[in-house]
């Protein structure tokens, strides 16, 4: 199918599930900042007036979890009259954390395929499959639908934080549908923005008048600024623009919906444009291959596309708990590759070390929170873990690897 419409969504940091992702990753940041060897699997639940921290943590760090949770919620914007029914200062915070299972710890500490190589001594923290993807649709080598959905969500949040539209509240979602012709993005078919807001705007109380006001404001202050540097831009005449289709969005955040860590895994990755192994990222330390190997898979896929060895590349990795080396490596280029997939796999095996300890070392994952002033992983917990133009992410820096692949591939051409 070469002509189609593809749709992806994003959410703001005030979405209930994203509140949870940020809290879980803020816990991870705090623990790794004090103790880079911390083992963390932190889950968060939010509901009306309640935040629950649970999971397994083994660490020498001392963290005031209740204070941390309240600070994250406050920074997102849920405080006082702008809280929308969920207040950082008054919500109950419950902490129910255990230590990591010794059975899991044993597998990570001493791999089944152990030898004299230090990187072989750290096994994967669990079994699983991870996918990485890249394509040439955007400068950051991401699919256009998810890239644009994130741009809109980021701008929506910026407008709220800067009080440009003082009636906006923290919860919000964006969705973008792109027209493809011969498999290439052609135009923006539909933009959908749902944003929480005050029940009254500048004295306006009529539901339809409020929705029309928000629609006009968002087109001017969110859609146009978010797309001004794109080759494919929205057109007020041809792009369908939907805002709060139910009519109003006053009740939102945890008051409107319960939130849970790890429920926005498609938003976190490629917007459904590529496959997903099912594992979430937030609240997990780097020994969890759900996170670290997914970063590595993106690193490999982006290096392939950056090297112009394919227009699209999807990399699957699989691991067994307690085993360092991947069980399998698969690359798919969707008939866009300039060399065979077998040759690409050969290059991957030669130029990328995909054992957990090697990935952690390559990206310095254990030390990044400390180096970044105590906050690193939390910043990835909203607006995607890949293709971020606003963050300095080591798995996005592929120039050196791409150059190696481009040179090495010449023997296959």
Swiss-Prot record:
ATP binds at residues 15, 171-173, 248-249, 257, 263-264, 280, 284. Mg(2+) binds at residue 17. Transmembrane segments: none annotated. The keyword Magnesium applies. GO terms for cellular component: cytoplasm. K(+) binds at residue 43. Pfam families: S-AdoMet_synt_C, S-AdoMet_synt_M, S-AdoMet_synt_N. It is found in: Cytoplasm. It catalyses: L-methionine + ATP + H2O = S-adenosyl-L-methionine + phosphate + diphosphate. Catalyzes the formation of S-adenosylmethionine (AdoMet) from methionine and ATP. The overall synthetic reaction is composed of two sequential steps, AdoMet formation and the subsequent tripolyphosphate hydrolysis which occurs prior to release of AdoMet from the enzyme. Homotetramer; dimer of dimers. This is S-adenosylmethionine synthase.
């Amino acid at each position: 199918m070469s002509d189609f419409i593809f749709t992806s969504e994003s959410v703001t940091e005030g979405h209930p599930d994203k509140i949870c992702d940020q809290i879980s990753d803020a816990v991870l940041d705090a623990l790794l900042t004090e103790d880079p060897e911390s083992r963390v699997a932190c889950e968060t639940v939010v509901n009306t007036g309640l935040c629950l921290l649970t999971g397994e943590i083994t660490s020498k760090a001392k963290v005031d979890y209740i204070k941390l949770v309240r600070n994250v919620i406050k920074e997102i914007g849920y405080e006082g009259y702008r809280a929308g029914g969920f207040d950082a200062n008054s919500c109950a915070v419950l902490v129910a954390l255990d230590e990591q299972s010794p059975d899991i710890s044993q597998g990570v500490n001493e791999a089944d395929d152990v030898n004299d190589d230090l990187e072989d001594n750290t096994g994967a923290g669990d079994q699983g499959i991870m996918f990485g993807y890249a394509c040439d649709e955007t400068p950051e080598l991401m699919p256009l639908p998810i890239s644009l959905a994130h741009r809109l969500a980021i701008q929506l949040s910026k407008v709220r934080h800067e009080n440009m539209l003082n009636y906006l509240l923290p919860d919000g979602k964006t969705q973008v549908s792109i027209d493809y012709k011969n498999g290439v993005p052609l135009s923006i078919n539909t933009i959908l923005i749902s944003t929480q807001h005050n029940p009254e705007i500048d004295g306006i109380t009529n539901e339809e008048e409020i929705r029309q006001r928000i629609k006009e404001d968002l087109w001017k202050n969110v859609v146009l600024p978010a797309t001004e540097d794109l080759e494919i831009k929205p057109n007020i005449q041809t792009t369908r623009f939907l805002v709060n289709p139910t009519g109003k969005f006053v009740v939102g955040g945890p008051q409107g919906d319960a939130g849970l860590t790890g429920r926005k895994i498609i938003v976190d990755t490629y917007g459904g444009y590529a496959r997903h192994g099912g594992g979430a990222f937030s609240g997990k330390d780097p020994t969890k291959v759900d996170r670290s190997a997914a970063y590595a898979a993106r690193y490999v896929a982006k290096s392939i596309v950056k090297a112009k060895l394919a227009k699209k590349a999807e990399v699957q990795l699989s691991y067994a708990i307690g085993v360092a080396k991947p069980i399998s490596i698969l690359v798919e280029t969707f008939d866009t590759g300039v060399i065979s997939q077998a040759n690409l796999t050969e290059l991957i095996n030669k130029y990328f070390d995909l054992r957990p300890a090697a990935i952690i070392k390559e990206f310095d994952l254990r030390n990044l929170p400390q180096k970044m002033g105590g906050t690193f992983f939390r910043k990835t917990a909203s607006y995607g873990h890949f293709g971020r133009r606003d963050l300095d992410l080591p798995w996005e820096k592929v120039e050196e690897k791409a150059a190696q692949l481009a040179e090495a591939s010449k023997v296959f051409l």
